């Protein structure tokens, strides 16, 4: 049986006129649509029922046949087939054109395919197509040239001179069709290949482009003359509907207008041809027909667009596909789904980690079919119809059934914007009163949700498989780690931290200080009867079993710490339990701040896995809320204490600045130096005031507690409240040298207030711009890496990359340990001192192995990397390493490309927009933040280019009055000199050794330059470390492997330089694995291999260069992608995720992979019988 959804690939091509007629159910002859009185479609019109099918189910046009029993009969009066009205969504019609017209995509696109295949310029082509010039089709004996253009006057003269029959010339699409018809693709291809060998420069480029088009037609089996249309397909009427509005007027799709113009002009042309009208009139009509068809296919591509009422350009067929509102992005990639609801969220502190509160009204609507089925099953209702009535009337017994149905049926909660995969998680629903969804407070961080009016959507997984996946893979309790860096995302926040912090504080001289208790329980009891304070330092005897015998020891602690440790497993490895002295201590014997809580959760996850961790998190949550209420930490203005030292520090600063000004006035220092020193001094003073302030605050000061615990606020905010606001930036980003001396407690004067407003306003503007930019970056990243999926266990490569710590100047940005954890080694790691193998090749490195390698003093390690993976589609599990979200080895089928894109895109909003103005760099500022990331991923030439050394050697600096020059002397005596522009800072000193590709001046490097000097590996390493620098400086951790996935996609293509004996065309881009395969094929029969150079594409270019035309067309430049794909007769192999979503198949990742889909469960009957037999005997 042929199943519609069961196919492996999809191909696109040019449609021949025969094919179009075959699709069609009849010719549309009249421009009429619907009769406005009877509201029935006109016969042979654009909505004709005879062609497209009946408007109403099982009812013909004239009403002779009604009811389903006449199914399939064609009415003898009106000719309409009695069938479902749904066929009006799939049946097509056609229009027979009286004169051929050209297809605007192939004539007007860049490059013009029609122009290339005919070897004509698009301008000449336009003159012919739009009846401005004649073209010579066959010169016969005359001295005219083939394809020569003649204007009206020249044509007349030629006819007079040589006679009417002596040559053939024509105009319009007919002439072009004749020329296209004459082309012999095989000979053209051979001729062009010969020409290619002799030519060079611009001519060569043109020949390569022509050859590409000719080869596309030759290989795909498309006929070039099909670029000229004789028959136009008419799309089904329900896809271009016409509906009646309240006032009796009609609203219609723009396509109907465009089709109507084509039909009108076509019919008029037919009439003129029948009448034998003069040539000039016919010609004008043909030109109008050509323009009407152009507008229908792509309105506005040539000339002024056809406008509807109110000067609005009409939406043509191309516009239906393009852009965010087009078919691809609006209906195919994102659909509205049934079984969903949305509501406001409120906090649910009483919920367990895996639960959410679902309003009753919403639940009954969502679970309606399930409730109805259960009612019938339990015999409460007799049939489905009465069950439906019961649910709609909301009878009391329905609620009981709902409770049962809901019991183990997870729901998905989603909050827009869904920036990473933690934006959709599964929860076990609990019915609640009211109309708001209740959300667990620990799930807020992942969703980035707060309760100031946020809304969330609920979706219901229907099938058993979907429910299983939701429960095992998406349940909130299992999503504890962040996929981007493997750190816990469910860290307690705000009140929970504050409560835990309060609980683990200690206070000298509190009530009951120094008392001793015989056990934990006695100490807790003493606290409950208010004999001792929760922060009092007391002595408690602790018991634990060592080798089967009970031992005890008195330790110093507080009741708060005892209570806090009740909910924490006592074997997280924070205390060395082997050492007898320490082994009785509490696991958490320190202040619980946001950082330390994160560490506790991390340890718990590594030791005990997700289930225990989620239980511990719920306990911490309950404790935190309880004790933050008991602690009752509040803020009053009396808590903001201005330190006494402040005024002394300010005075001292003023004196220093006076000295600096004096030096400047005497000409010892330049203005720039003065500015820098002033800024430096004020920065230092502000810092000193802040430090003095933090030292002077009591540790029970509520503001200090909030900031120190990490619950809310930061040191810099306290500095502004009680210290001084410090330096401000002007709107341009330059720092103003007058600081704000006041704090908010003392109050700002008018000038200070005015200076403050700059920053605030710029901040708001930046945030708005940043969100859009960040979203667009994520979209491009997803598009470039969406088809990267873990496809196999091991690709068997011996290659890898060397990693060492990433530095910015002297500051370590990413440690080596962090780069090793969860990766596989690419060679044996040998201890440099003893020569022992510390870690064998191709083995997984856990944190312990990484520590061992780093502590042995090894600075550079060769690891398996996505860069060097030999997997043709996707990557292999060994080259990828650990799954950051589970801290285990990655599973086959994981969509690592999407995860990489989300991990890089999600923190995009946190990156600042600012381009920083660093003093002293003349002219060009160094871009930072989001624009810098974008610049790197798009592989653009950066602003503020650095000068790069092309060779390795020793640097020498020569200064003359006019300029500075750096000369690099290579080991082999080769010299390169670089002129340094005025105002640039040097990065090298006299007689420094520089490597090839090192920067000589400050600034950013063009990645393409690095590629030409250091090769593809150098470029990849550069991109990786540069992107890491931007993110790390903002305090965002992203694991290397995510960046590797994207950078690998940017460097996959090879540009053919010389084709050798292969079928590859010079100048074309090809996937590197296809390139190696083709070369291997040629090598087998001893031919000459092709030569190519690796290219670095920006993410937009790389996304458009994918093998899948569906994915590329739905990304950007839809018409261009489809034009090219149609000419090449491209086949989309459906390997990525996007193309499968578009055609409605399961995505080939996770359980949708073929290896999982093709599993069959078979029972071995003998085995079953044996087991049954054994059970019976027992």
Curated annotation (Swiss-Prot):
Its cofactor is Mg(2+); Zn(2+). GO terms for biological process: DNA-templated transcription. Zn(2+) 2 binds at residues 795, 869, 876, 879. It comes from the Bacteria. InterPro entries: DNA-dir_RpoC_beta_prime (IPR045867), DNA-dir_RpoC_beta_prime_bact (IPR012754), RNA_pol_asu (IPR000722), RNA_pol_N (IPR006592), RNA_pol_Rpb1_1 (IPR007080), RNA_pol_Rpb1_3 (IPR007066), RNA_pol_Rpb1_3_sf (IPR042102), RNA_pol_Rpb1_4 (IPR007083). Binds 1 Mg(2+) ion per subunit. Mg(2+) binds at residues 450, 452, 454. GO terms for cellular component: DNA-directed RNA polymerase complex. Gene3D superfamilies: 1.10.132.30, 1.10.150.390, 1.10.1790.20, 1.10.40.90, 2.40.40.20, 2.40.50.100, RNA polymerase II, clamp domain, RNA polymerase Rpb1, domain 3. Its EC number is 2.7.7.6. GO terms for molecular function: DNA binding; DNA-directed RNA polymerase activity; magnesium ion binding; zinc ion binding. Disulfide bonds: none annotated. It is an enzyme of class 2 (transferase). Zn(2+) 1 binds at residues 60, 62, 75, 78. The keyword Transcription applies. Keywords: DNA-directed RNA polymerase, Magnesium, Metal-binding, Nucleotidyltransferase, Transcription, Transferase, Zinc. It catalyses: RNA(n) + a ribonucleoside 5'-triphosphate = RNA(n+1) + diphosphate. DNA-dependent RNA polymerase catalyzes the transcription of DNA into RNA using the four ribonucleoside triphosphates as substrates. Belongs to the RNA polymerase beta' chain family. PANTHER family: DNA-DIRECTED RNA POLYMERASE, DNA-DIRECTED RNA POLYMERASE SUBUNIT BETA. The RNAP catalytic core consists of 2 alpha, 1 beta, 1 beta' and 1 omega subunit. When a sigma factor is associated with the core the holoenzyme is formed, which can initiate transcription. This is DNA-directed RNA polymerase subunit beta'. The lineage of its organism: Bacteria, Bacillati, Bacillota, Clostridia, Eubacteriales. The gene is rpoC.
């Amino acid at each position: 049986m042929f199943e519609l959804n069961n196919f492996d690939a999809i191909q696109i091509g040019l449609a021949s006129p025969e094919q179009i007629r075959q699709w069609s159910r009849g010719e549309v002859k009249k421009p009429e649509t619907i009769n406005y009185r009877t509201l029935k479609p006109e016969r042979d019109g654009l909505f004709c029922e005879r062609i497209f099918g009946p408007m109403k189910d099982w009812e013909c046009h004239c009403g002779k046949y009604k009811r389903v029993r006449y199914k399939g009969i064609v009415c003898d009066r009106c000719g309409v087939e009695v069938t479902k009205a749904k066929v009006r969504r799939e049946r097509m019609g056609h229009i027979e054109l009286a004169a051929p017209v050209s297809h605007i995509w192939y004539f007007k696109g860049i490059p013009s395919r029609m122009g290339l295949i005919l070897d004509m310029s698009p301008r000449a082509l336009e003159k012919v197509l739009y009846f401005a010039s004649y073209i010579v089709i066959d010169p016969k004996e005359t001295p005219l040239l083939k394809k020569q253009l003649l204007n009206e006057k020249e044509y007349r003269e030629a006819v007079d001179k040589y006679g009417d029959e002596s040559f053939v010339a024509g105009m319009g699409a007919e002439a072009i069709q004749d020329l296209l018809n004459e082309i012999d693709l095989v000979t053209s291809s051979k001729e062009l290949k010969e020409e290619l060998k002799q030519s060079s420069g611009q001519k060569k480029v043109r020949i390569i482009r022509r050859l590409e088009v000719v080869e596309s037609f030759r290989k795909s089996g498309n006929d070039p003359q099909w670029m000229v249309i004789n028959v136009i397909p008419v799309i089904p009427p329900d896809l271009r509907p016409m509906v009646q509005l309240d006032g009796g007027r009609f609203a219609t799709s723009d396509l109907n207008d465009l089709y109507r113009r084509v039909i009108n002009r076509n019919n008029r042309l037919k009439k003129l041809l029948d009448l034998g009208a003069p040539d000039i009139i016919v010609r004008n009509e043909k030109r109008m027909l050509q323009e009407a068809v152009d507008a229908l296919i792509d309105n506005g591509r040539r000339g002024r667009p056809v406008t509807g009422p109110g000067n609005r350009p009409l939406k043509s067929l191309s516009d239906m596909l393009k852009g965010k509102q087009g078919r691809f992005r609006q209906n195919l990639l994102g659909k509205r789904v049934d079984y969903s609801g949305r509501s406001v969220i409120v906090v649910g502190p009483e919920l367990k980690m895996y639960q959410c509160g679902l309003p009753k009204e919403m639940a009954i609507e969502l679970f309606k079919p399930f409730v109805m089925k259960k009612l019938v099953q339990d015999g409460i209702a007799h049939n489905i119809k009465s069950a439906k009535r019961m649910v709609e009337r909301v009878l009391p017994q329905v609620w009981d059934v709902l409770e049962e149905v809901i019991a183990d049926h997870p729901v998905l909660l989603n909050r827009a914007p869904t920036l990473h995969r933690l934006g959709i998680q599964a929860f076990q629903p609990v019915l609640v009163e009211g109309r708001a969804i209740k959300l667990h407070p620990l799930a807020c961080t992942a969703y980035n949700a707060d309760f100031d009016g946020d809304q969330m959507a609920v979706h219901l997984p229907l099938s058993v498989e979907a429910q299983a996946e939701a429960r095992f893979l998406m349940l909130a309790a299992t999503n504890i780690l962040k996929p981007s860096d493997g750190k816990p995302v469910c860290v307690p926040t705000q009140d929970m931290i504050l409560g835990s912090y309060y609980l683990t504080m200690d206070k000298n001289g509190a009530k009951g200080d120094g008392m001793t208790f015989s056990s934990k329980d006695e100490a807790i009891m003493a606290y409950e009867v208010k004999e001792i304070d929760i922060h009092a330092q007391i002595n408690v005897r602790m018991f634990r079993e060592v080798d089967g015998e009970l031992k005890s020891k008195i330790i110093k602690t507080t009741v708060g710490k005892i209570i806090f440790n009740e909910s924490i497993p006592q074997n997280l490895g924070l205390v060395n339990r082997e050492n007898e002295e320490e082994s009785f201590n509490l696991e958490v014997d320190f202040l619980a701040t946001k950082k330390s809580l994160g560490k506790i959760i991390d340890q718990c996850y590594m030791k005990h896995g997700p289930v225990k961790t989620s239980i511990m998190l719920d306990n911490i949550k309950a404790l935190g809320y309880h004790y933050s209420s008991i602690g009752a930490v509040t803020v009053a203005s009396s808590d903001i204490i201005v330190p006494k030292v402040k005024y002394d520090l300010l005075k001292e600063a003023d004196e220093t600045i006076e000295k600096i000004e004096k030096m400047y006035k005497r000409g010892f220092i330049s203005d720039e130096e003065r500015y820098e020193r002033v800024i430096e001094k004020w920065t230092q003073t502000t810092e000193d005031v802040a430090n003095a302030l933090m030292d002077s605050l009591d540790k029970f000061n509520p503001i200090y507690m909030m900031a120190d615990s990490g619950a809310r606020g930061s040191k810099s905010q306290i500095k502004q409240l009680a210290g001084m606001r410090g330096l401000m930036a002007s709107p341009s980003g330059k720092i103003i040298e007058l600081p704000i001396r006041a704090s908010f407690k003392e109050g700002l004067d008018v000038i200070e207030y005015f200076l403050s407003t700059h920053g605030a306003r710029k901040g708001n503007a930046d945030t708005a711009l940043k969100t859009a930019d960040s979203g667009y970056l994520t979209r491009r990243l997803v598009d470039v890496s969406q088809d990267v999926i873990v496809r196999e266990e091991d690709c068997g490569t011996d290659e890898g990359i060397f990693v060492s710590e990433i530095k910015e100047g002297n500051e370590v940005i990413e440690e080596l340990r962090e780069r090793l954890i969860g990766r596989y080694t690419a060679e044996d790691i040998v201890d440099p001192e003893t020569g022992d193998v510390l870690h064998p090749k191709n083995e997984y490195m856990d944190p312990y192995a990484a520590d061992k390698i780093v502590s042995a003093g090894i600075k550079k390690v060769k690891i398996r990397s996505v860069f060097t993976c030999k997997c043709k589609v996707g990557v292999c599990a060994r080259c990828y390493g650990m799954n950051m979200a589970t801290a285990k080895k990655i599973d086959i089928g994981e969509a690592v490309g999407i995860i990489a894109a989300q991990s890089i895109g999600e923190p995009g909003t946190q990156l600042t927009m600012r381009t920083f103005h660093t003093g002293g760099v003349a002219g060009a500022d160094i871009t930072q933040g989001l624009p810098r990331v974008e610049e790197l991923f798009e592989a653009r030439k950066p602003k503020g280019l650095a000068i790069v050394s092309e060779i390795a050697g020793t640097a020498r600096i020569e200064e003359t009055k006019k300029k500075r020059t750096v000369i690099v002397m290579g080991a082999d005596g080769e010299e390169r000199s670089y002129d340094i522009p005025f105002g640039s800072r040097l990065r090298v000193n006299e007689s420094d050794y520089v490597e090839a590709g090192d920067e000589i001046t400050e600034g950013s490097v063009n990645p393409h330059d690095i590629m030409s000097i250091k090769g593809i590996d150098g470029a990849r390493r550069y991109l990786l470390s540069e992107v890491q620098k931007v993110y790390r400086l903002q305090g965002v951790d992203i694991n290397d492997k995510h960046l590797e996935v994207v950078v690998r996609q940017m460097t996959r293509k090879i540009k053919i330089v010389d084709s050798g004996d292969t079928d590859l065309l010079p100048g074309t881009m090809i996937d590197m694995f296809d390139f190696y395969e083709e070369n291997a094929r040629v090598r087998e029969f001893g031919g000459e291999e092709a030569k190519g150079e690796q290219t670095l594409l920006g993410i937009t270019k790389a996304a458009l260069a994918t093998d899948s035309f569906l994915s590329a067309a739905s990304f950007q430049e839809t018409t261009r992608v489809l034009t090219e794909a149609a000419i090449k007769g491209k086949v989309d192999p459906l390997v990525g995720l996007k193309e499968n979503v578009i055609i409605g198949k399961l995505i080939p990742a996770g359980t949708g992979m073929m290896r999982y889909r093709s599993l069959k469960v078979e029972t071995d009957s003998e085995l079953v019988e044996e087991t049954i037999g054994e059970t019976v005997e027992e």
